[in-house]
Amino acid sequence: SAVLRETGAEIIELPPLEAYPDSVFVEDTALCLPQGAILMRSGAPTRAGEVAQMAPVLRGLYDEVLEISGPGCIEGGDILTTGREVLVGLSERTNRAGVSELAQLIERWGYRLRWIEIPQGVLHFKTDCSLLDNETILSTPRLAASGCFSDYRVIYTAEGEEAGANAIRFNTLVLMAAGFPKT
């Protein structure tokens, strides 16, 4: 959080949820857009209670908070919002029913959704890609090989540095873990 604070970002720190050790991955619980937030429905039973903990926080920040009601499941780690569309990867944690419900919810805000088949063995879509700017995506070669980014500029991770594709963009700043010098 120190790096984000240096950019001028306002950081909201939440108390740890001991019953949910994966709750540190807060992006999985909600999709936050300028128009409002959408609470996700986790595909992992061990994470099912996280959304209920995050909901009051988001309701305090957004005028409109919608919710994936099911039966489908979807997690934020499978969602990449670009300048022109919302890309969603189908994974072990995100299925077609969840994606369909999300498409219906974001349509009211003017967003178009496109789903992507992600390679086997990839936990989340954004494990293998990040948005660098509205038209440029940092991607592993294995994900980009599907053609899912054919309408974008793509920068590929170097061989052996696939984990470097998981970066965080904040306004015009891209934060990336150290240890990926070629990428």
Residue ranges of predicted features:
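The feature marks the mature, well-folded catalytic cores of soluble enzymes
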Residues: 1-183
